[in-house]
Amino acid sequence: MGCTLSAEERAALERSKAIEKNLKEDGISAAKDVKLLLLGAGESGKSTIVKQMKIIHEDGFSGEDVKQYKPVVYSNTIQSLAAIVRAMDTLGVEYGDKERKTDSKMVCDVVSRMEDTEPFSAELLSAMMRLWGDSGIQECFNRSREYQLNDSAKYYLDSLDRIGAGDYQPTEQDILRTRVKTTGIVETHFTFKNLHFRLFDVGGQRSERKKWIHCFEDVTAIIFCVALSGYDQVLHEDETTNRMHESLMLFDSICNNKFFIDTSIILFLNKKDLFGEKIKKSPLTICFPEYPGSNTYEDAAAYIQTQFESKNRSPNKEIYCHMTCATDTNNIQVVFDAVTDIIIANNLRGCGLY
């Protein structure tokens, strides 16, 4: 999934230049407030988008941020390994080397003692590296759609020697990939293209959704995030529901909500990198039995996009769709630039200037 500019992105760039020229000519210099609501099911990448705004539109992560994320990286790493270890039993997978059972006990003990946010001891690090290298663990990892596993598990476990080093400091990418469940509403402020943005990240799990209603007033646009890679997975909070089906249901209720009759909806079909890898091995018919196409990235992604767009029951509402990879700063920068231009164009249209 390279980052060369697509035709869509080139067109967005041209549009961007034209809009900026129009703004200058019309002398519209007063910065406007833009209220963006970031919605989507749990683990769709909303909080990662917020972190990207910090990198792109603020000054990135401070020394204090790095310090705060360090224990989260330790926890995400060992908790991911512990989840695979637990699944070994559930799925009945054997270790490649029976000696690994001792290592797995050590990992699970650390987690059960709630010491998962601590730096790894030399002994624990060795045990974790041996486990991650075990053929049984790898077989179990390859079946991760059958249990709940953090998307960043492989990223962190492949970096064990770096994360386990005594002088370890989280990199920007390490921080972008951290997973902490969002509870409540997180608000971020930044200025871009003469607009004051207020971005609201709202918890995606079902229990969090009742808190969204307070944010609904005067929303300029909604960014709705979907994890493309969730098509063959079930929810954390309800293991009978497919993640993609849940996203579609939620999108339907947001898109056709009376509060949002005149609100622009921007659809981020996210985790395109994970989806591109997964679609080679896991057919889309798992989620959409009626899917007639091939299991290529292009065909499958286009089909999913159509499924979401078809939920829109308003003939006057346009859904602006982007394929995204929230952990890729360049991709999010280009996409957010295009999103901002849509907002500016809609604002100007509202004033009769565009």
Swiss-Prot record:
The modification 5-glutamyl histamine is found at residue 205. Mg(2+) binds at residues 47, 182. A lipid is attached at residue 2 (N-myristoyl glycine). The keyword Hydrolase applies. The keyword Acyltransferase does not apply. GO terms for biological process: adenylate cyclase-inhibiting serotonin receptor signaling pathway; G protein-coupled dopamine receptor signaling pathway; G protein-coupled receptor signaling pathway; locomotory behavior; negative regulation of insulin secretion; postsynaptic modulation of chemical synaptic transmission; regulation of heart contraction; vesicle docking involved in exocytosis. Pfam families: G-alpha. Residues 32-354 form the G-alpha domain. Residues 324-329 are annotated as: G5 motif. GTP binds at residues 43, 46-48, 152, 176-179, 270, 273, 325. The GTPase activity is promoted by GTPAse activators, such as RGS14, RGS16 and RGS19. Residues 197-206 are annotated as: G3 motif. Residues 35-48 are annotated as: G1 motif. Residues 174-182 are annotated as: G2 motif. It comes from the Eukaryota. Keywords: Cell membrane, GTP-binding, Hydrolase, Lipoprotein, Magnesium, Membrane, Metal-binding, Myristate, Nucleotide-binding, Palmitate, Transducer. GO terms for cellular component: cell body; dendrite; GABA-ergic synapse; glutamatergic synapse; heterotrimeric G-protein complex; membrane; myelin sheath; parallel fiber to Purkinje cell synapse. It is an enzyme of class 3 (hydrolase). Residues 266-273 are annotated as: G4 motif. InterPro entries: Gprotein_alpha_I, Gprotein_alpha_su, GproteinA_insert, P-loop_NTPase. It is a lipid-anchor. Guanine nucleotide-binding proteins (G proteins) function as transducers downstream of G protein-coupled receptors (GPCRs) in numerous signaling cascades. The alpha chain contains the guanine nucleotide binding site and alternates between an active, GTP-bound state and an inactive, GDP-bound state. Signaling by an activated GPCR promotes GDP release and GTP binding. The alpha subunit has a low GTPase activity that converts bound GTP to GDP, thereby terminating the signal. Both GDP release and GTP hydrolysis are modulated by numerous regulatory proteins. G proteins are composed of 3 units; alpha, beta and gamma. The alpha chain contains the guanine nucleotide binding site. Forms a complex with GNB1 and GNG3. Interacts with RGS14. Interacts with RGS16. Interacts with RGS19. Interacts (when palmitoylated) with ADGRG3. Belongs to the G-alpha family. G(i/o/t/z) subfamily. PANTHER family: GTP-BINDING PROTEIN ALPHA SUBUNIT (PTHR10218), GUANINE NUCLEOTIDE-BINDING PROTEIN G(O) SUBUNIT ALPHA (PTHR10218:SF361). This is Guanine nucleotide-binding protein G(o) subunit alpha. It comes from Mus musculus (Mouse).
